[in-house]
From Swiss-Prot:
Record GO biological process: carnitine catabolic process; fatty acid metabolic process
Complex and partners: Homodimer.
Positions contributing to NAD(+) binding: 14-19
GO MF term list: carnitine 3-dehydrogenase activity; NAD+ binding; oxidoreductase activity
Gene: cdhA
EC number annotated for this UniProt entry: 1.1.1.108
InterPro entries: 3-OHacyl-CoA_DH, 3-OHacyl-CoA_DH_NAD-bd, 3HC_DH_C, 6-PGluconate_DH-like_C_sf, 6PGD_dom2, L-carnitine_dehydrogenase, NAD(P)-bd_dom_sf
Protein name per the record: L-carnitine dehydrogenase
Summary of the function given for this chain in its UniProt record: Catalyzes the NAD(+)-dependent oxidation of L-carnitine to 3-dehydrocarnitine. Is specific for L-carnitine and NAD(+) as substrates. D,L-3-hydroxybutyrate, L-lactate, ethanol, L-malate and D,L-isocitrate are not substrates. Is involved in a L-carnitine degradation pathway that allows P.aeruginosa to grow on L-carnitine as the sole source of carbon and nitrogen.
Reactions that this protein is recorded to catalyse: carnitine + NAD(+) = 3-dehydrocarnitine + NADH + H(+)
Temperature sensitivity of activity: Optimum temperature is 35 degrees Celsius for the reaction in both directions.
Keywords for the protein's UniProt record, in alphabetical order: Cytoplasm, NAD, Oxidoreductase
Pathway assigned in UniProt: Amine and polyamine metabolism; carnitine metabolism
């Protein structure tokens, strides 16, 4: 079966931080967007988020015809998805909610239209169990801010067609993203599993009084974080092995993985630990508002992405390599 990959109308269900990021990205790529969210005040909040993201998108470069005015907010699921060429759901992470939602979405959508979910914690075989034409249903898990970060993890369920996964990856690429096919259904997929391991270690370091939240963030942003933005973990460690490469690195440093100085279980989230984390991050934030920090983050991301793209091209690499 073939699926629609030429997208003119993008349907978005859920308009919170993630959903609005999808909407802003689709608008910036010159698409018409139809959005639905049953929460009170959702439309006004959505339009404000899109407006806040637009300066960064303008700096990155808008597609011909891209305009915030091409967003239409509707009152029903059926009106949202009925004429859509691609559907992205970004609803709260509740299995019962997603089961019902996708039964309704899939019943109202054309059978050759792909349906993606932004879920980070649920598996597609579970929440697409009652969907019509489940062969076109999958996960497209993005990262915040969705309108700037290119990574999207694409995960198929037990009944997802292989062609649907390939088609979805083409659609996401057309939106300027770097789709990553997750080969097996596994909780947390790829990136969040890595991030959760780091998060657990960070909480232990705060809980044990080893470092403040600011010091831990400094350890990442002035160290490994800079390398990760263009090289990743495995290639970084390959270089650490010198001319002998990864095999030498594994032989030299592999035994250290058995040392008992790292934690795998998360620390107990006591009130004292929560207070310490909240107080530390409040000190880091200072007097800056969340909106100010979002604009700062967006400008930094644009600068980093631009520098990486330019440097890779100079060395003969494509951006996705």
């Amino acid at each position: 079966m073939s699926f629609v990959t030429e997208i003119k109308t993008f349907a978005a269900l859920g308009s919170g931080v993630i959903g609005s990021g999808w909407i802003a990205r689709a608008l910036a790529h010159g698409l018409d967007v139809v959005a639905w969210d049953p929460a009170p005040g959702a439309e006004a909040a959505l339009r404000a988020r899109v407006a806040n993201a637009w300066p960064a998108l303008r700096k990155q470069g808008l597609a011909p015809g891209a305009a915030q005015e091409r967003l239409r907010f509707v009152a029903s699921i059926e009106e949202c998805v009925g004429d859509a060429d691609f559907i992205q759901e970004s609803a709260p992470e509740r299995l019962d909610l997603k089961l019902d939602l996708h039964a309704r979405i899939s019943a109202a959508a054309r059978p050759d239209v792909l349906i993606g979910s932004s879920t980070s914690g649920l598996l597609p075989s579970e929440f697409y169990a009652e969907a019509s034409h489940p062969e076109r249903c999958l996960v497209g898990h993005p990262f915040n801010p969705v309108y700037l970060l290119p990574l999207v993890e694409v995960v198929g369920g037990e009944r997802t067609a292989a062609e649907a996964v390939r088609a979805a990856m083409r659609v996401y690429e057309s939106l300027g993203m770097r789709p990553l096919h997750v080969r097996k259904e596994v909780p947390g997929f790829i990136a969040d599993r890595l991030l959760e391991a780091l998060w657990r270690e960070a909480l232990h370091l705060v809980n044990d009084g080893v470092a403040t939240t600011g010091e831990i963030d400094d350890a990442i942003r002035f160290g490994a974080g800079l390398r990760w933005s263009f090289m990743g973990t495995f290639l970084t460690y390959t270089l650490a092995g010198g001319n002998a490469g990864m095999r030498h690195f594994m032989a030299q440093f592999g035994p250290a993985l058995q040392l008992p100085w790292t934690y795998l279980p998360a620390p107990e989230l006591t009130e004292a630990l929560i207070d310490r984390v909240v107080e530390g991050t409040a000190e880091q934030q200072g007097a800056r508002s969340i909106a100010e920090l979002e604009r700062y983050r967006d400008d930094c991301l644009l600068a980093v992405l631009g520098a990486i793209r330019e440097t890779k091209a100079r060395h003969g690499f494509a951006f996705a390599e």
